[in-house]
Amino acid sequence: MKRRPHKVISVLLLAALIAGMGMACRERSLEIRNKRWEENAETVTQNSGRIFGDEPENLYARSAVLIDADSGRVLFEKEADVIRPMASTTKIMTCIIALEYLKEHPDQTVEVSDQAVSQPKVHLGMQRGEAFYLKDLLYSLMLESHNDSAVAVAEGVAGSVEKFAEKMNAKAAEIGCKDTHFITPNGLDAKDTGGVHSTTAKDLAKIMRYCIMISTEKETFLEVTRAKEYQFQDTEKKRSFSCHNHNAFLDMMDGALSGKTGFTADAGYCYVGSLRRDKRTFIVALLACGWPNNKGYKWKDTRKLMEYGLEHYQYREIDKKMQIPEIKVAGGVDDKKPYQYCLNVPVKIERPAEENSKILIRDGEELRAKLELAKYWNAPLKKGEKVGMLTYYLESQKIAEYPLSIKKTVKKRTVWWCICWVVKNVRL
């Protein structure tokens, strides 16, 4: 008879635990409404991102863009999506494709064809049948902008100019260029069934960003394009050649990193260049920036845009310590809280440890963080399971996105678990 109260208590405990399961099940209608966390977004910080005044004005270029090379974010644009001829700025794509090819074929040589010899000035002055090391020709291509070297490089890498153009267009698509069409490796005005040889300022900046920030051969690209001069010979050492860098921007501003000029009758003067200072890297792309006798317009526009970036944009830390609220998991198991049928479970931000946690922001510009996280869930849930998303915006532009996941596994409460818990913890 003395044990009877304990049995009663045990039965009541078991009933309470099972009742808890029932209440957890009644949470399901709420859980269903909230399961799609994408539909339950909450703006946790809301700040004005409006920018006022001080933007570059009176640019000579018909199309221009300034981007942050780290993120690819556009900081300033003028008709940056208008398709225009690009002249010899084309050669940055020719160069990076050749450098990536050389990684697997470091001693590649090129025999000069009639097509290469026939290219108009500016040219190296090759002779049919001569042979050169492919890497030597890249200095001729980038320092002197030799058109014959561009054709020789294309033929050495792909066998023909046409096949090399296919590689150029494939690489452009890979980079994310949407309005670029390559026909020639040197940028001379051309037209085919796909259209004219052309790009946009925005696409051209993307290509330069790939060359200096993303490609496996970015360091070699900088080595070639920054060289003051370079000497080489044909493979039989019969003739010697000397190249000098004509990119005046490299001596124009502290931190000037790389660049390529261009000019044709259709394109006008063009330029794409980059600058790195105080851990900030900017890229400027200009198309149709004057015609003769206005050769200096591109340098004025480049300086104006670079100075705008340097003066107004600084890095700001993305808040790594942002507090994410716990979620409630119905019908879960916690041995330390057996009577609690709705558990509070912590959530973490899945941010790669090596990722740059800073973003380039204009003075007066603010970050906006959007938290998408459902408050109620049903067990079971596994550790690391995705339960939401944290997204950062600058105005309407998404600049970072991180999944949210739970920190621990939550097992489902069952009748059998309740019975086992009572047997284990209650003395009958």
Annotate each predicted stretch with a short phrase.
Residues 6-26:
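Sec-dependent N-terminal signal peptides of Gram-positive bacterial secreted proteins and lipoproteins
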Residues 12-13, 88, 255:
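Hydrophobic alpha-helical transmembrane segments of integral membrane proteins
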Residues 2, 27-216:
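Active-site-adjacent loops and short helices of periplasmic peptidoglycan-processing enzymes
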